[in-house]
């Protein structure tokens, strides 16, 4: 049978029929260890890197790498012994890091391909029961990881496809490499400048991802497909960029937002691991330079240095790859540091937990003070209870280990949310859990599922120094006010006039409200806590313009009648009735970035006329944030407007709203009319339009639904129905958990409709829902799978893949 070229693969992928399933025995062997006396550690029934089966990690890695190397070295009987043992016994890969177990699974597949003449049905059966489900689950959950994960997963997919001669699986691997909505796809991992998605993280992971992409290209080349050439030799640019930086040269760098939205704060190349060269550069060099005659000057220089290192015996034979250090290149100094701030005397502390932090490379643990906050936690049976939780805050760079010791009770399990962030809870004993952070997060540590006394962890990059902030204020012609660490009553909070920068030293606690009123050009920065005892308004912004609030922990912070307001690294926790977290009333150009809300009413709202503020609400954006609604909605749009205000003849508009990269940890609202994590309810003659929900992850709905989009007349709060809702997009919204309550889209009448609602990439428990999804009975509506009720006076609802 005639096989298709890559050009036809790309144009007519569905028609691939046969492949030249071969493996070059000339592939360089990474390790030169003598395997003739190797003793197998396994086989293991379950392989994992974390959790219950984590003890299988090292042994399974050694075994599967040994099988590949021995097959290449001609030690066929010993390779077959390992292959057959795992083919008979291995059932699955387990744990959060199961996709990374496909590193060794790839080695095993390559060994099996070399030894295919001795294959048995058990080989393919093992691949299909253990490897392919792990690949499928990763794709169902994607995108959520840095790109080396996706590249590693896809490398194993291609190796498995070649091993078992599955042309459809091979086609999927090529499609993923070129087009996947994951950081592990070539165009999402390597930019047109050569910068990699993980360049800003560190060089070990960037080279790991590049190496996996090179392996994919090598396997495809063995089948006659030239993935090296994809996107105008894009991978060559990534290899050259990496070689250039790791040899000590400067490189261009641009902060970008990756497809997960999680890894977008790196503003320079990651210096960790710089100059520690992984043996990944020879394969691409031989292809691009040796075969195609292209130029790779930095890679050429790197390989020349590598040969010298080999002659001097300076190359370390690692399990995953050989490595060596480039002479004269050192890691940067901006590495692992942690910054903790003692609580001031008089601040409300809580002693349920002892929390310790340790930067990577240090032997010392530092205790972090634990504050108390009240929440209105759900306790089941349509009930809530005011309870006390704990929270800590610290800053760090690089990596930091966190140890949490439960002082008052024993526990069996620990969960660290958002789940999507992938923070692994390593339970040390019945009172201690430990985990690693490699970038700042806002997290909830929950023991045995308890959310009534959990621990919140707020972390950030270190704030700007007092001296630098003062210099900036002076250059801007602003007044600079510095508040030193301490506990402050309401009367100690200064007035904040226009053209003021207020710097709160870490370790400041306030029991009053920072009132920004009728002002412009105001900044509150540093690290402070402002939590009045009644539970409302640690800060508010009224009738003001050009305002920045950065690094403040508070209860609530409404913004009314204002323009150009930014809240960054603000954390809101509330417990009383009507305890909305971050409300917007009749304001425009409001940005929320990296905020956290756990509130006793709506976490964030966008209203028009309300609370004495008149007018429309426009250009509201929230990104990179975490929302937890103990009551009501995480996001609520549109209810209030001019009909209930002093000028009921006016028509307000709520428009141009973007919510992106949001984790929603809870909705617990028993009243059906107030459910919907993503809720739009046009009232008071409002027109709500141009709304985008993008990359939203929802988990743990106690009582609630995914969405409500309505035009309604709620007589409790409104004087009239809304005018309508139009042009709303739900893009890459994902829910994982038990069956949610019924979502609703419903208009009011023929003059007050819902129009043009688009769903793109909607996933419910890993299943992508769209109008053409396979297996959907023709008589089913796509909405039934959510479940979603589409009522009357609704036009143009579409579900796209």
Model-identified regions with their sequence ranges:
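Extracellular beta-strand-rich solenoid/capping regions of secreted or surface-exposed proteins
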Residues: 435-437, 488-501, 509-525, 531-549, ...
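Extracellular beta-rich repeat passengers
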Residues: 669-801
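Right-handed parallel beta-helix
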Residues: 499-501, 506, 520-531, 545-555, ...
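Extracellular "leader-to-stem" segments immediately downstream of a signal peptide or signal-anchor
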Residues: 23-26, 329-498, 511, 518-520, ...
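Hydrophobic/aromatic side-chain positions at a characteristic register within alpha-helices
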Residues: 71, 161-165
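Acidic/His metal-coordination segments adjacent to aromatic residues that form catalytic metal sites
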Residues: 86-93, 134-140, 183-203
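Extracellular glycan-targeting catalytic surfaces
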Residues: 25-143, 151, 155, 178, ...
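Bacterial Sec-dependent N-terminal signal peptides
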Residues: 1-26, 31
